[in-house]
């Protein structure tokens, strides 16, 4: 299978988000990479579903709360930026303060 660097990145994000989802489901608090992967994958899937950039910016800030991540993670993550493919092309989605 021949994958572009962008496709490899998306596959890595998806794989890391699966680990994060399973840990979250078991009641474990997510660390920094898991939180980033969890939010990023949700944004990528939302773009694939046809949601708008504005919708995803708002949605991304509702995915995780401070209680679901390890101490210090919200402060380490002032924003998440994801380059997502929409029906009309690739756009950068920025979620400010994604963990509230």
Curated annotation (Swiss-Prot):
UniProt name for this protein: Urease subunit gamma
One function term, GO molecular function aspect: urease activity
Subcellular location: Cytoplasm
E.C. designation(s): 3.5.1.5
CDD domains: Urease_gamma
Reaction it catalyzes: urea + 2 H2O + H(+) = hydrogencarbonate + 2 NH4(+)
GO CC aspect terms: cytoplasm
One Pfam match: Urease_gamma
Known partners and oligomeric status: Heterotrimer of UreA (gamma), UreB (beta) and UreC (alpha) subunits. Three heterotrimers associate to form the active enzyme.
Domain of life: Bacteria
Pathway: Nitrogen metabolism; urea degradation; CO(2) and NH(3) from urea (urease route): step 1/1
UniProt keyword list: Cytoplasm, Hydrolase
Organism: Synechocystis sp. (strain ATCC 27184 / PCC 6803 / Kazusa)
Similarity-based family: Belongs to the urease gamma subunit family.
Broadest EC class assigned to this enzyme: hydrolase
GO biological process: urea catabolic process
Encoding gene, per UniProt annotation: ureA
């Amino acid at each position: 299978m021949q994958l572009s660097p962008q496709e490899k990145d998306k596959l890595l994000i998806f794989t890391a988000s699966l680990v994060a989802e399973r840990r979250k489901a078991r009641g474990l608090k997510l660390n920094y990479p898991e939180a980033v992967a969890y939010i990023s994958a949700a944004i990528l899937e939302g773009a694939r579903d046809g949601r708008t950039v504005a919708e995803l910016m708002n949605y991304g800030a509702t995915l995780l709360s401070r209680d679901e991540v390890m101490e210090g993670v919200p402060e380490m993550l002032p924003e998440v930026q994801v380059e997502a493919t929409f029906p009309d092309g690739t756009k950068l989605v920025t979620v400010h303060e994604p963990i509230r």
